[in-house]
Amino acid sequence: MTQANLSETLFKPRFKHPETSTLVRRFNHGAQPPVQSALDGKTIPHWYRMINRLMWIWRGIDPREILDVQARIVMSDAERTDDDLYDTVIGYRGGNWIYEWATQAMVWQQKACAEEDPQLSGRHWLHAATLYNIAAYPHLKGDDLAEQAQALSNRAYEEAAQRLPGTMRQMEFTVPGGAPITGFLHMPKGDGPFPTVLMCGGLDAMQTDYYSLYERYFAPRGIAMLTIDMPSVGFSSKWKLTQDSCLLHQRVLKALPNVPWVDHTRVAAFGFRFGANVAVRLAYLESPRLKAVACLGPVVHTLLSDFKCQQQVPEMYLDVLASRLGMHDASDEALRVELNRYSLKVQGLLGRRCPTPMLSGYWKNDPFSPEEDSRLITSSSADGKLLEIPFNPVYRNFDKGLQEITDWIEKRLC
C-alpha cells in the first residue's frame, strides 16, 4: 500500500484552502474567561483550538510530541488569519495546524511501513491515525484539508486493525432517506456473539478516537464496541445533526439483530459529551433494545438552553456546534434559539420516567456539563446511578471513572 503517495495526492497544493477558524462566521463574544475541562482540554492564550492534552495522551500520544508540534506552529512566521492566534496559519505549509500534525502522522506511517513485527506495526499505524485526527480537529464542515486528514486517519486505522489483537470489521448500515453510513465493530478474542457497547462520541471527535476505550476497558471483559461517526463528520458527513440527534445510532441499533457477531439482546450505549444526548434519547425511544445507558460529561440540557452557560464556552466549541447544525453564517441569537430545541428536557424526554438503567458521570464545575444535567438523567431513570469524578489527579481519576462505568455496564450486559 502506497500511503505516502496517497498523502501527496490528497494534500496536493491548490490555490487557497480556507483556514479553519474562518469557516464559521458568527458574532464573537469578545474576551472569555479561561476554561479547563477533563474531556475537552483547556483554553490557552493565543490559540483558537482548545488544547486537549488529556485525551490526546489517553489516545497514546506522548506529551513531548504534543509540545514539539505546538512549538513548530508557534515558531512559524507565515501569514495568519489572526496574528494573535498561533494556529491560524493560512494554507497547507509549515506552521499550519493541519500541516504540522499530518507531517507528524506521516513519520509514524513510515515507521509502520518499515516495521516487520505486525503488532508493533499496528501500534504505529494507530499512532498515525490518532495524529491525523488531531490534524483534522475540530472537524468543521467545509474544512477541505481536515477532511483529507480524516481520510488518511481512516486508512491508517484500517491498517492498524489488521495487525492489532482481536478482530475489527468495517460495516455499512443503510439509512432511509439518505446515504449509508460506515461503522467499525471491534471484537475481543473468543467466540461471538458478544455483548456490545454502542459508542456515541462527542461532536469534536471521530469514531476512530475511541480505540483506547475498547482496548483498555471493554475488550478485557469480553465486550465488543461498535462505533459510528456523529452526523456531519467522517463517514456520516452527508447527514446533518438534527433535533432527532439519535437518528443514525437508532438505525444501527435496529440493524443489530442481523449482525451475527453481536448479541443484540445484550447491548448498551455509552455517550461522551453531546454523544450522551444521543444515548439518552435512545434510552427513551429504544428501551427494549438497550440493557443500559452510560454517560460522561453529558450535554443534554443546560449548555443547550442557558445563555450564561453558553457565554462561558470557548469560541471553538460554539463553532463546532454551529458547524454540526449547518449554521455557518447564523447570528449568535439564531444559534441559541436552535440549540434550545436540542435540550432533551425541552423536548419533553428528560424528567419523564425512563425504564432503561442510566449512569451519568460528571466533574464539579464542568463548564460544559453541570452536575444538574447528570442528576436530571439519573433521577429520570428507574435504575439511575450518579458518579462524581474528582478533577485532580486528572488522568488517574479519568481512568478510575471509566473503570467504574465499565463495571456498571458489565453487570447489566454479562
Curated annotation (Swiss-Prot):
Protein name as catalogued: Esterase FrsA
Keyword annotations of the record: Hydrolase, Serine esterase
Domain of life of the source: Bacteria
InterPro entries in the record: AB_hydrolase_fold (IPR029058), FrsA (IPR043423), FrsA-like (IPR010520), FrsA_esterase (IPR050261)
PANTHER family associated with the record: DIENELACTONE HYDROLASE DOMAIN-CONTAINING PROTEIN-RELATED, ESTERASE FRSA
Role summary: Catalyzes the hydrolysis of esters.
HAMAP family xrefs: FrsA (MF_01063)
